[in-house]
């Protein structure tokens, strides 16, 4: 990743703001990208105005997912205490543990793939967005990653939700 990190640094050195939304695979990166590359890290969703439009930007991890086991595990992974303890483990073991955990997680899914789009009334991020939109009707664009599907769905005459897709396979 050295060349990629170099390009990030090159962009920020030129004054370009690079924003990174931390997700389920990124919680362990700490402040490295900020200190070394000048990247602006976001641990929570961000609402911002761009060219007169309201944007709600987020990774998407944990938003609207009803799975209680997932929520418990997520809260443990996001614990600063547990992150500090994990960082004390030598990378020889911690990296292997992380890779094994991710492999096991993928194997639990059919064919090891992310589930396809589940439809407007079952997709967690869409349901979350519809609910959020009720109390924040001025937001024009909700943009997420997390789910490895591509989606562009109009929610109203002035609001849409976009899920960016799988950047490895589709871009």
Residue ranges of each PLM-predicted region?
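Glycine-rich phosphate-binding loop signature in dinucleotide/nucleotide-binding domains
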Residues: 14, 50-52, 134-138
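Active-site-proximal loop/helix segment associated with metal-binding centers of metalloenzymes
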Residues: 60-124
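Short low-complexity stretches enriched in small and charged residues
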Residues: 9-18, 96-100, 116-120, 139-140
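Short, Lys/Arg-enriched charge-dense amphipathic segments
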Residues: 2-9, 41-49, 107-120, 166-170
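A generic short-segment signal for beta-strand/edge and adjacent turn/coil regions
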Residues: 11-18, 23-28, 109-112, 128-133, ...
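Core catalytic region of metal-dependent phosphoesterases/phosphodiesterases
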Residues: 1-50
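Conserved beta-sheet core of the metallophosphoesterase superfamily
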Residues: 38-44, 56, 61, 65-73, ...
């Amino acid at each position: 990743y050295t060349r990629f990190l170099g390009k990030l640094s090159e962009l920020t050195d030129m004054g370009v703001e690079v924003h990174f939304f931390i997700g389920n695979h990124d919680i362990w990166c700490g402040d490295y990208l900020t200190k070394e590359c000048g990247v602006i890290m976001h641990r929570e969703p961000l609402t911002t105005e761009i060219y007169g439009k309201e944007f709600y930007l987020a990774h998407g991890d944990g938003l609207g997912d009803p799975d209680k086991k997932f929520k418990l595990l997520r809260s443990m992974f996001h614990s600063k205490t547990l992150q500090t303890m994990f960082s004390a483990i030598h990378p020889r073991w911690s990296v292997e543990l992380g890779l094994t955990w991710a492999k096991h997680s993928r194997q639990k899914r059919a064919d090891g793939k992310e589930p396809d789009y589940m439809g407007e009334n079952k997709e967690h991020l869409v349901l979350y967005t519809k609910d959020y939109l009720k109390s924040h009707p001025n937001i024009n664009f909700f943009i997420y990653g997390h789910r490895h599907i591509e989606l562009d769905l109009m929610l109203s005459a002035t609001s849409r939700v976009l899920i960016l897709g799988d950047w490895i396979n589709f871009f």
